[in-house]
Amino acid sequence: MPETAYALAFDTANEVISIGLGRLNAAACAVEPVAAVEVAAHRASNTQLLVRVDALLREAGVERGQLACVCVGRGPGSFTGVRIAMATAKGAAQALGAALVGVSSLDVVAWHAWASGVRGRLAVVADAMRKEVYPVRYALDDAGVHRLEADRVVKAQVAAQELVDEASSATDRKSTRLNSSHQKISYA
């Protein structure tokens, strides 16, 4: 019987280190969650990441050699935090002979919403500091998550206005569709 294979995922793009471990289920093309931890690590990702990964693996009873995939959050986020995660993931994947996958931290939020049953339009916005944000819009339907734009940095006020304008436009389109599909009723 083949040894169980696992995927290790982590993200240090923000002030919280997120680490997850999943069992790979090739038959179902799925990853089954095994364990996860989030740790507040303000400017301490470099000293906390590997310690916390080792603890999670130990608690789950998983050996490093069972890791077939390393998945890393590639931001957007803290310049140093993203580089710590990327370098750690690349080194671990290379040392273990495991696959390496980079994932947008914003896409993870959208996929989590989708997996929780959210459908329709979704905006994910992350703080970029200095009154700027990383906004990305998505369409979530039964087929999955569809990213509608590339990563970018804009002033928070600009992103907020864009979202208000989009919501107003969607409301206007919906109103127009309703009006054109129903008879006009007048009271004289």
List where the protein language model places each region:
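Single conserved hydrophobic/aromatic residue that forms the stacking wall/gate
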Residues: 174, 178-188
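N-terminal beta-alpha supersecondary unit
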Residues: 2-74
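Surface "functional belts" at beta-alpha junctions
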Residues: 25-32, 38, 44, 99-177
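Fold-independent oxyanion-binding glycine-rich loops
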Residues: 10-13, 52-53, 74-75, 82, ...
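DPxDG-like acidic metal-binding loop motif
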Residues: 71-102
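Short amphipathic alpha-helical face segments that pack within enzyme cores
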Residues: 48-52, 87, 91, 108
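Stable alpha-helical structural segments in soluble proteins, enriched in small hydrophobic residues
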Residues: 56-60, 95, 113
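Short, glycine/acidic-enriched loop or turn micro-motifs at the edges of active sites
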Residues: 14, 130, 182
